[in-house]
Structures are given as structure tokens and as C-alpha cells.
Amino acid sequence: MSLLSDLINLNLSDITDKVIAEYIWVGGSGMDMRSKARTLSGPVKDPSKLPKWNYDGSSTGQAPGQDSEVILYPQAIFKDPFRRGSNILVMCDAYTPAGEPIPTNKRNNAAKIFGHPDVAAEEPWYGLEQEYTLLQKDVQWPLGWPLGGFPGPQGPYYCGTGANKAFGRDIVDSHYKACIYAGINISGINGEVMPGQWEFQVGPSIGISAADELWVARYILERITEIAGVVLSFDPKPIQGDWNGAGAHTNYSTKSMRNDGGYEVIKKAIAKLEKRHKEHIAAYGEGNERRLTGRHETADMNTFVWGVANRGASIRVGRDTEKAGKGYFEDRRPASNMDPYVVTSMIAETTILWKP
């Protein structure tokens, strides 16, 4: 095993200029992540300089067998925390050979929204809070929970420490450092209310970069849990009963909101979001109805409510924002399995471009 470990950690930069590029894309379910690697003749820092590539879309649920070729377009580059050196992770989106985005390519439409002059002028910032649950591999039961049983009730686990409260911290810290190494703007981590559940935050990041970074952070976490022999779940309600679900709270601001008088802009934006509540809920993640029940720090999905410092609201405004008269707000509706390309661009579209 020591030889295998040595080979895994082999530093190729001592002997060659060649680098390995791991191309990453979103699979057919809209949540599964796929990747494959190729050799490049030398380091590349601009995604437009990377070659397009193809894959078998019939094996990912993204193309029929008789016309299975799907084309990957490189969009964002990150340092590879697994191979290190000059090796890279490449976030891609997927197109038909004719150049049309495939149905599961949500990045293409997001890029159009973020590229709109009115949106670009507002410089939308996002802070994405990604909750997730770690499961024991063979039984699909949360890490640290007794087999076939339940731990003590919620209370001591949120930001808790100790062997009977925090389960999987090595995975969480490894992921934190790996994201920083990769160049992802990860801003923090914490243990969540349900034992075995954790959260990391990405941002503040501007526009589509926030979604690129969250997808790659998810990919890195998936790879780390693979190494650890633990299953990663983004199910918005992994355990039924008196246990918190998992969300992806989305913090958002525009230049107008961050400037003096921004609180009035925030209130107008929230009024727009209320008018399109059903459309947003429909796009905010599969199975979210099991989470948005009005309990466990959520608002009922059929009701829109906003408030200051209210974690039972659809939209929460922080007390600092209210006091300063400018700042940001938090959309608490997105589920943990949401597509960040969809959610971030939809919030921008509704609050900046949409005319009621």
C-alpha cells in the first residue's frame, strides 16, 4: 500500500511539463457529477485555451444510444487538490455536436442572464450555504447514528464538539482545505442541527462564478467521501420525523442593495420574489416539499413570508442590514440538491430584469 500511496502522490512536475486536466460536468439526473481526465502538453490557466471534449451521453442519461455524443465546453479552471502540482479541475457544460445546450445544461441560460447589461451593472453577489448529510456506506444511515436506531434529540449537535456530537469532522476539514487549495472562495464550515449533517459556505462570489464554485466544491466533497468510504447525500429531508432537513440558503445582494438606501431596494426585490413564489419553489430542488413544512427552521412551501432575523421565513433579512439600511438578504427556500446555476440566475432575473 505504501507504493500505491507513493504513486498517487507522485509529483510529475519534476520530470515533465505535461499536466492532467479533470473535466467535470453535471450528469443526467441534474445532480450527479461526472468526470474524466486527459493529458495536456503544458499548464493552462484560461478555459478558452482548453480543448473541447466529448463523452457518451447514453451512459449518463443525456443522449440516445444511436446519437450518443455530447460535447464538453470548458468554462472554469481550478487547481486540483488531489493530483496537485500544475494539474487542474475543469468545470464544463454540455452541448450537442451542433452546438445546442443539452436539457440538463443549466449554465448556458444562467450565463445569458448574468451577461445581460442590467444584471452585470448590478454586480450580483452570492453567498451559498450548502448543507449535506454523511451516510454510512453499507446501510445508508447517517454517520454516527446507531444501526437501526436514533441518537439523542437535536440540540447538542449544531456547531458541537466531541465524539458523541460531531461525526465526520475529518472529512469536513479535508474538504475545507481542499477547496481553499483549489481556489474556491469557501468562507466557512459548521456542524448542523441534525447529527451527521454539515454545512459549508461559498462566497461572496459574483454572478455565475458562485455557481461554478459550488459545483466544484460539491465535486471535491464527493471525491473526499469516496476516499473515506462514506456516502454523501444532498437529500433535502434524509430522515423523516423530528429532524432538520438540508437546504442551500442563498444570500444575495446587488450594488443598489449594498449602497445607501439599499434597504428600500431589498424590500422591492422581496416583493417581486413574493409574486413569483410558485415559480421559484418549482425550480428550487426536488423533494423540497418534504423539507419546507413550516417546522425545523423553514417556512411552509405554500406560504411566502419574510422577516428580520426570522429563520422560519421564506426570506430572512439580517438585523445588521436593517440597522445599516443596506446590505443583503437570505433566500431560505432552496433545497440542498438545488442547481446553483438555476437558483442564482433566477433570483437575479426576478429581482433585476422581471417587470411585474
Curated annotation (Swiss-Prot):
Known tissue expression: This is a nodule isozyme.
Segments forming domain GS beta-grasp: 19-99
Residue ranges occupied by any GS catalytic domain in the UniProt entry: 106-356
One protein family per Pfam: Gln-synt_C
Gene Ontology process terms (BP): glutamine biosynthetic process
Molecular functions per Gene Ontology: ATP binding; glutamine synthetase activity; identical protein binding
Annotated Gene Ontology cellular component terms: cytoplasm
Chief location category: cytoplasm
Catalytic reaction equation(s): L-glutamate + NH4(+) + ATP = L-glutamine + ADP + phosphate + H(+)
Keywords (A to Z) from UniProt: ATP-binding, Cytoplasm, Ligase, Nitrogen fixation, Nucleotide-binding
Top-tier EC class: ligase
Enzyme Commission number, as recorded: 6.3.1.2
Compartment(s): Cytoplasm
Subunit structure: Homooctamer.
Listed PANTHER family: GLUTAMINE SYNTHETASE (PTHR20852), GLUTAMINE SYNTHETASE CYTOSOLIC ISOZYME 1-1 (PTHR20852:SF93)
Entry's family note: Belongs to the glutamine synthetase family.
Name the UniProt record assigns to this protein: Glutamine synthetase cytosolic isozyme 2
Native source organism of the sequence: Glycine max (Soybean)
